[in-house]
Protein backbone atom coordinates (compact mmCIF):
# COMPACT_ATOMS: atom_id res chain seq x y z
CA UNK A 1 0.00 0.00 0.00
CA UNK A 2 1.17 3.51 -0.74
CA UNK A 3 2.20 5.57 2.26
CA UNK A 4 0.70 8.37 4.20
CA UNK A 5 2.99 11.38 4.35
CA UNK A 6 2.34 13.42 7.46
CA UNK A 7 3.53 16.34 9.53
CA UNK A 8 3.36 16.46 13.29
CA UNK A 9 4.71 19.21 15.51
CA UNK A 10 6.45 18.63 18.82
CA UNK A 11 3.00 18.14 20.42
CA UNK A 12 2.98 14.77 18.62
CA UNK A 13 -0.83 14.76 18.25
CA UNK A 14 -0.79 13.88 14.56
CA UNK A 15 2.06 11.41 15.09
CA UNK A 16 0.09 9.54 17.75
CA UNK A 17 -2.92 9.36 15.43
CA UNK A 18 -0.79 8.00 12.58
CA UNK A 19 0.71 5.35 14.87
CA UNK A 20 -2.81 4.11 15.70
CA UNK A 21 -3.53 3.65 11.99
CA UNK A 22 -0.81 1.02 11.61
CA UNK A 23 -0.36 2.00 7.96
CA UNK A 24 2.88 2.77 6.09
CA UNK A 25 3.78 6.38 6.86
CA UNK A 26 6.58 8.87 6.26
CA UNK A 27 6.99 11.91 8.51
CA UNK A 28 7.90 15.34 7.19
CA UNK A 29 10.72 16.53 9.49
CA UNK A 30 9.90 19.23 12.03
CA UNK A 31 13.12 21.19 11.52
CA UNK A 32 16.85 21.01 11.87
CA UNK A 33 17.52 18.75 8.93
CA UNK A 34 19.22 19.94 5.78
CA UNK A 35 18.06 16.98 3.75
CA UNK A 36 14.66 17.54 2.19
CA UNK A 37 12.09 14.76 2.17
CA UNK A 38 11.51 13.49 -1.34
CA UNK A 39 8.84 10.87 -1.91
CA UNK A 40 9.06 8.27 -4.64
CA UNK A 41 5.48 7.05 -4.95
CA UNK A 42 1.96 8.47 -4.80
CA UNK A 43 0.79 9.30 -1.28
CA UNK A 44 -2.00 10.73 0.82
CA UNK A 45 -1.00 13.74 2.93
CA UNK A 46 -2.16 13.93 6.55
CA UNK A 47 -1.77 17.42 7.96
CA UNK A 48 -2.72 19.37 11.09
CA UNK A 49 -4.22 22.86 10.83
CA UNK A 50 -2.61 25.80 12.61
CA UNK A 51 -3.13 29.53 12.77
CA UNK A 52 -5.93 29.81 15.30
CA UNK A 53 -8.59 30.04 12.61
CA UNK A 54 -6.80 32.33 10.18
CA UNK A 55 -6.02 31.18 6.63
CA UNK A 56 -2.57 32.71 7.10
CA UNK A 57 -0.50 30.07 8.84
CA UNK A 58 -3.13 27.31 8.61
CA UNK A 59 -0.77 25.06 6.64
CA UNK A 60 2.47 24.32 8.53
CA UNK A 61 5.52 25.88 6.85
CA UNK A 62 7.22 22.48 6.69
CA UNK A 63 4.29 21.15 4.64
CA UNK A 64 4.42 24.19 2.35
CA UNK A 65 8.13 23.58 1.73
CA UNK A 66 7.49 19.89 1.08
CA UNK A 67 4.73 20.67 -1.44
CA UNK A 68 6.75 23.44 -3.09
CA UNK A 69 8.95 20.68 -4.51
CA UNK A 70 7.26 19.96 -7.88
CA UNK A 71 8.19 16.27 -7.66
CA UNK A 72 6.52 15.84 -4.24
CA UNK A 73 3.50 17.86 -5.32
CA UNK A 74 3.05 15.72 -8.44
CA UNK A 75 2.60 12.58 -6.31
CA UNK A 76 -0.05 13.79 -3.85
CA UNK A 77 -3.34 11.97 -4.40
CA UNK A 78 -5.47 13.13 -1.47
CA UNK A 79 -5.43 14.96 1.86
CA UNK A 80 -6.65 14.23 5.38
CA UNK A 81 -6.70 17.00 7.98
CA UNK A 82 -6.62 17.28 11.75
CA UNK A 83 -7.96 20.35 13.47
CA UNK A 84 -9.74 21.92 16.39
CA UNK A 85 -13.47 22.66 16.26
CA UNK A 86 -12.80 25.73 18.42
CA UNK A 87 -11.62 27.35 15.17
CA UNK A 88 -15.21 27.35 13.84
CA UNK A 89 -15.34 27.71 10.06
CA UNK A 90 -11.56 27.33 9.94
CA UNK A 91 -11.78 23.77 11.37
CA UNK A 92 -9.26 21.66 9.43
CA UNK A 93 -8.59 24.59 7.11
CA UNK A 94 -5.19 23.22 6.05
CA UNK A 95 -6.93 20.27 4.39
CA UNK A 96 -9.27 22.55 2.46
CA UNK A 97 -6.41 24.78 1.30
CA UNK A 98 -4.20 21.89 0.17
CA UNK A 99 -7.10 20.11 -1.55
CA UNK A 100 -7.91 23.24 -3.57
CA UNK A 101 -4.32 24.22 -4.39
CA UNK A 102 -3.19 20.71 -5.34
CA UNK A 103 -6.53 19.72 -6.92
CA UNK A 104 -6.82 16.47 -4.95
CA UNK A 105 -9.73 15.07 -2.94
CA UNK A 106 -10.21 16.12 0.67
CA UNK A 107 -10.72 12.63 2.06
CA UNK A 108 -11.38 13.06 5.80
CA UNK A 109 -11.03 15.36 8.77
CA UNK A 110 -10.82 14.70 12.49
CA UNK A 111 -10.44 16.66 15.70
CA UNK A 112 -7.17 16.81 17.64
CA UNK A 113 -6.05 13.25 18.47
CA UNK A 114 -8.98 11.64 16.69
CA UNK A 115 -11.33 9.04 18.13
CA UNK A 116 -11.31 5.26 17.79
CA UNK A 117 -14.01 5.74 15.15
CA UNK A 118 -11.75 8.16 13.24
CA UNK A 119 -8.95 5.58 13.26
CA UNK A 120 -11.29 2.93 11.81
CA UNK A 121 -12.71 5.36 9.23
CA UNK A 122 -9.31 6.59 8.06
CA UNK A 123 -7.78 3.11 7.91
CA UNK A 124 -10.75 1.82 5.90
CA UNK A 125 -10.94 4.91 3.71
CA UNK A 126 -7.23 4.90 2.87
CA UNK A 127 -7.27 1.18 2.06
CA UNK A 128 -10.32 1.55 -0.20
CA UNK A 129 -8.87 4.67 -1.84
CA UNK A 130 -5.70 2.83 -2.91
CA UNK A 131 -7.69 -0.20 -4.08
CA UNK A 132 -9.70 2.08 -6.38
CA UNK A 133 -6.49 3.68 -7.71
CA UNK A 134 -4.86 0.39 -8.69
From Swiss-Prot:
The record's GO molecular-function terms, alphabetically, read:
FMN binding
User: Where is the chain membrane-spanning?
Assistant: none
The domain of life for this entry's organism is Bacteria
Classification via Pfam families: Flavodoxin_NdrI
Q: Which GO terms describe its biological process?
A: protein modification process
Please report any disulfide bonds recorded for this protein chain, giving both cysteine positions: none
Q: Which PANTHER family match?
A: PROTEIN NRDI
Similarity remark:
Belongs to the NrdI family.
Function (record text): Probably involved in ribonucleotide reductase function.
Listed name of the protein: Protein NrdI
Q: Per the UniProt entry, what species is this protein from, by scientific name? A: Yersinia enterocolitica serotype O:8 / biotype 1B (strain NCTC 13174 / 8081)
**What gene makes this protein?**
nrdI
Amino acid sequence: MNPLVYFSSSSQNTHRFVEKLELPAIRIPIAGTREKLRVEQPYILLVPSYGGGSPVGAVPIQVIRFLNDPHNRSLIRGVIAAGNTNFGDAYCLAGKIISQKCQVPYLYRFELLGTAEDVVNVRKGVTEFWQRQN
